[in-house]
């Protein structure tokens, strides 16, 4: 082999190994690239109990319960499926029924979600794109002009 042929062979083999490595990394990360799963996604994909995921959707109206010892129970819904969530801790200030939420944790054996972290959306009008897409898929999207929950009091009151 000439020097030029060895260099070309080395480059071709190196590019092949690099492409294989990138492919393996992307394959391994295929499930962790998703920011969160909607309740419908959890049911459709058959998420295993104990598998850590992020569950996102809307906090179902009337589902918030204060349990003893700082435990809180509420339902997360995308209007097609609903998953009960149990959380122990202090909820974010922006957390309330009818608003978007992302929870981190795992399903237990009964299909309930045990959260160890709860993230609330930024303001009354923000909705994560994934939640909006899930609402559109289920036919519950009310459009850009729809009034946000509790919007009659938004902007009223005194601020420091």
UniProtKB/Swiss-Prot annotation:
The chain crosses the membrane at residues 8-28. Its main location: membrane. It comes from the Bacteria. Keywords: Cell inner membrane, Cell membrane, Cytochrome c-type biogenesis, Heme, Iron, Membrane, Metal-binding, Signal-anchor, Transmembrane, Transmembrane helix. One of its GO terms (biological process) is cytochrome complex assembly. It is a single-pass type II membrane protein. Residues 141-160 are annotated as: Disordered. Residues 29-160 are periplasmic. Heme chaperone required for the biogenesis of c-type cytochromes. Transiently binds heme delivered by CcmC and transfers the heme to apo-cytochromes in a process facilitated by CcmF and CcmH. Belongs to the CcmE/CycJ family. This is Cytochrome c-type biogenesis protein CcmE. It comes from Parvibaculum lavamentivorans (strain DS-1 / DSM 13023 / NCIMB 13966). The lineage of its organism: Bacteria, Pseudomonadati, Pseudomonadota, Alphaproteobacteria, Hyphomicrobiales. The gene is ccmE.
